[in-house]
Curated annotation (Swiss-Prot):
Protein source organism: Mesorhizobium japonicum (strain LMG 29417 / CECT 9101 / MAFF 303099)
Gene for this chain: deoA
Name of the protein this chain belongs to: Thymidine phosphorylase
EC number: 2.4.2.4
One Pfam family of this chain: Glycos_transf_3
Pathway it works in: Pyrimidine metabolism; dTMP biosynthesis via salvage pathway; dTMP from thymine: step 1/2
NCBIfam families: PRK05820.1, T_phosphoryl, Y_phosphoryl
GO biological process: pyrimidine nucleobase metabolic process; thymidine metabolic process
Amino acid sequence: MLPQEIIRHKRDGHRLSAGEIAAFIGGVTSGAVTDGQAAAFAMAVFFNGMNRDEAVALTLAMRDSGDVLDWSDLPGPVTDKHSTGGVGDNVSLMLAPIVAACGAYVPMISGRGLGHTGGTLDKMDAIPGYISQPDIALFRQAVLETGCAIIGQTADLAPADRRLYAIRDVTGTVESVPLITASILSKKLAAGLGSLVLDVKVGNGAFMERSRDATALANSLVEVASGAGLKVSALITGMNEPLASAAGNAVEVHNAVDFLTGRLRDRRLEDVTLALAAEMLQSTGLVSSNQDGLRRATETLTSGRAAATFARMVAVLGGPADFIEKPEKYLAVAPTEFAVRATTDGFVTGIATRDIGLAVVGLGGGRTRPDDKIDPSVGITRLLPIGAEVHAGDALALVHARSPADAEAAAATVVSAYAIGASKPAADKTVMRRILPRG
């Protein structure tokens, strides 16, 4: 069928068959479908949506547009996590080694940051020598030898998604739930997983600010993943403040090393990381209950086995062998430090989390366009959480910048992002809801 006929069919509100969807995505991959046709298709889906069967067919067609990894030779279950993104979200750096040290295999294919949210791959790139985009042979070696590897999407995995996403990004169709769902899941299915846990963020630092939108996305992801044959569950977690007390690249890696080694563990970050670890372990069958998973993940973290696994992963993928012992020796440090100070007494009652992320972007630590270069050394540390008591002159955060002018600009954004009130607010739940496939 001609691409324009498939577009017209969806434009007029009709359901597309699996064959129509496969033919269109085949054209996206081969180049037979033009950018204009792909954009028109995305807009038709944006306005008319897709039902579960259509979204499953789209996901599978995008998965099959490239290679699908096979981990059947591994002597254990294969699992992964996907986060919809936020600020100070360095969970993957602790989660992958925790779950791997418990006996699962975690081939984690991650993305780069765009907009106000940070990207896991950019964080790993802050480690000197670390090969974040290895060939398949080195990727497999790292997973086999250490139990986990955090890498970027290769050219051979879900190439249709890469092209379609670039078109969506410039045509106002990024927010379409079926297209988001297929984009996320096609890459995860191409990674050859046996199970997947989704961390769907909600709040003023997330892409989904409203609970109903986050729930709709979580339900779509869970139902489509299940329809595609993947064991799946989702947690909806809060993003009304940064998850870690650091936001940036090198600073979040340092925060992750401190977490793994026990030097510093931010409470909300620990809650989310261990909840996701328990969920992943239960999904693999390595534990019989969520409680058992939580206990085992906590034990693996506190014993140092997770830190040792992270250290081995970094070394196998080209990073320093002593990185976990001496992160400050290797991580870039910005030349200017600037304390952001409270102007009044009280309690931190709210944080405009998106603005914290945008302050990092303004420092050079994020992207406004996909081809922007990142400075790994800049960022913000010692971010006070909601509920902290402050006095006028106390530090709310510490900005790390390339110049005093950059530091002052970021500090102005950060200080205006903090709301200070007379009463201590009630603590928000960090993990809000668990979503499973229906039936």
